[in-house]
């Protein structure tokens, strides 16, 4: 057992500072066989007895590549070598896009953790992933939330939370770690298919930026994303606090006179909270802008949104079905 590398020390400092993986935790670790997940499993295994962690692995075979079965066999072989149990899932054939497969993967992760009494799902996302996601979202057009979308931890339910303990580590560091300990990294050839925008960003754009503009682009993106996260957390907490004070006790309605006094940033966040929590509707920016215009200019015209009617009545901004207000949950 080796626990003396700088990455071991960085890992322990991180989980203790952020209280990510307490003693006696039961961990379900997503394991692809790539360098990041191999480094994560190796480090967790090295500290397993010290922290009394119960560790199991979960592997997803998307069957998109001809060598996917060989990868799965290697993953299972490595799990047996470490005396760790592994859950293996094949992606249904009808899920043939990255987005649908990602949703299936996360739902399967959560369900497996819940059914088998794991209290923590562990993912191997790194600071490099965070930088790539930030740039990718920026190019597509996003809000502050999209620039800080990968977090240290997320509470998925009362029983299960998700953590990313390598989020301040870089891909160059996990690569070094795997070479140092001779870990059997499986190279995913699809990562070099530059017809995919994410791969082109990783293989061409970021190296170009490093060479000609900012050698520490990953570190700069990570720092910026972390600073944005602080602002996003504050705005979200403030929006939740105000929403709890202005919502109607019985009907789907809010005091729009109070909303009218707020900054547009808080107005939009409160509206998103209102529609997601009550109607499970994720409004787009145009719909949000229309509602804010309705509020700020006290327009009496109703707005139709997904079979609901949004209007104002006295001091209330309400959601109605036909002529009746809907009762709150």
Curated annotation (Swiss-Prot):
GO terms for biological process: tRNA modification. GO terms for cellular component: chloroplast. Keywords: ATP-binding, Chloroplast, Ligase, Nucleotide-binding, Plastid, tRNA processing. It is found in: Plastid, Chloroplast. Its EC number is 6.3.4.19. ATP binds at residues 32-37. GO terms for molecular function: ATP binding; tRNA(Ile)-lysidine synthase activity. It comes from the Eukaryota. This is tRNA(Ile)-lysidine synthase, chloroplastic. It comes from Pyropia yezoensis (Susabi-nori). The gene is tilS.
